[in-house]
Swiss-Prot record:
CDD domains: ABC_NikE_OppD_transporters. ATP binds at residues 64-71. It is an enzyme of class 7 (translocase). This is Putative peptide import ATP-binding protein BAB2_1053. Its EC number is 7.4.2.-. It is found in: Cell inner membrane. GO terms for biological process: peptide transport; protein transport; transmembrane transport. It is a peripheral membrane protein. InterPro entries: AAA+_ATPase, ABC_transp_ATP-bind, ABC_transporter-like_ATP-bd, ABC_transporter-like_CS, Oligopep_ABC_C, P-loop_NTPase. SUPFAM superfamilies: P-loop containing nucleoside triphosphate hydrolases.
Length: 334
């Protein structure tokens, strides 16, 4: 067995009996920005000791403001970025921090990534049937006839006519292009899709269609999703559990219904209160202040400078992630 990936044969089961197929423990990602003028290295910690789990057949929504580290976590989970320290386990296999491509190869089929911008994700000179077949060509285990049949199957699966296979990306709408990207991600029958702002570039009606498609695919194929988004309404529509990220740290996780109806962390509550209401005249809260610089975070709780409930201890002591019923929350109020 490779010295950069070791097998861990524990069977991770949640209390509800569902297998945990993704686990991160104290996951850290640092970016070295070079030398400080006064000496030493300038290091930006984009992800700070993040612990998450994803169970088989569920969707974990990952929310937070821009720059909170959401996309960085997603890219580490599919091997697009190495992690600095901590632990990643996929299907019971531990991924070493600087694992090479060869170490990731057995997992490539099982974990796929859906990018935010479907236009940028598709080669404009490549017919969409060829684009969808790219993973099949890399795997190289199908005949030409089998490859063509699989492309047709994938296009039907995402709601596109098979006759569209010979068209080019510019001939499609944004929503149709995202369906093509999803079809390509499904080519090798993955078990997990990491969806990084997968509907952010679409209008509201197209967003609803893609969300419904993802839910239908989950029901049909038993997929698990890490659904990364800043739009809380979309996350609510698609997720079973939600994790709230702030300045690279998890501040709260829990079942969708509980977290949306009664958020425990002040940041979770402020984030939900900032969402515009459909009712005319409904009050809307704005989170005061700015997200702290990841190069100079507060000594204690990262949210302390913006928190209306901050106490003295918050300024000096980082709050641990505590289990509160069916949730975890990092706050000195609990």
């Amino acid at each position: 067995m490779s010295d950069v990936m070791t097998a861990n044969r524990r069977s991770f089961l949640a209390e509800d009996g569902k297998e945990t197929i993704v686990r991160t423990d104290d996951l850290v990602r640092d970016f070295d920005l070079g030398h400080r003028p006064e000496g030493g290295r300038l290091v930006l910690r984009a992800v700070d000791k993040v612990s998450l789990t994803i169970r088989r057949g569920e969707t974990l929504g990952l929310v937070g403001e821009s720059g909170s580290g959401k996309s960085t976590i997603g890219r580490m989970l599919v091997g697009l970025l190495p992690y600095t320290s901590g632990n990643i386990e996929l299907f019971g296999q531990k991924i070493e921090p600087r694992a090479k491509a060869a170490a990731w190869k057995p997992l490539r089929r099982r974990v796929q990534f859906v990018f935010q911008d479907p236009h940028a994700a598709l080669n404009p000179r490549m017919r969409v049937g060829t684009a969808i077949a790219e993973p099949l060509d890399v795997a190289g285990n199908l005949t030409r006839k089998e490859r063509s049949a699989r492309v047709d199957e994938l296009m039907e699966l995402v709601g596109l006519p098979t006759s569209f296979a010979r068209r080019f990306p510019h001939e499609f709408s944004g929503g149709q292009r995202q369906r093509i990207v999803i079809a390509r991600a499904l080519a090798l029958n993955p078990e997990i899709l990491v969806c990084d702002e997968a509907v952010a570039s679409l209008d509201v009606s197209m967003q609803a269609q893609i969300v419904n498609l993802l839910k239908d695919l989950q029901d049909q194929l038993g997929l698990s999703y890490l659904f990364i988004a800043h739009d809380l309404a979309v996350v609510r529509a698609v997720s079973h559990r939600v994790a709230v990220l702030y300045a690279g740290q998890i501040v709260e996780t829990g079942p969708r219904t509980a977290l949306y109806s009664d958020p425990l962390h002040p940041y979770s509550r402020a984030l939900l209160d900032s969402v515009p209401r459909a009712r005319r005249g409904a009050p809307r809260s704005i989170i005061a202040g700015e997200v702290p610089s990841l190069l100079n975070k507060p000594k204690g709780c990262a949210f302390c400078p913006r928190c209306p409930k901050a106490m003295d201890i918050c300024r000096d002591v980082p709050p641990p992630l505590r289990v509160i019923g069916d949730r975890e929350v990092a706050c000195h109020l609990y």
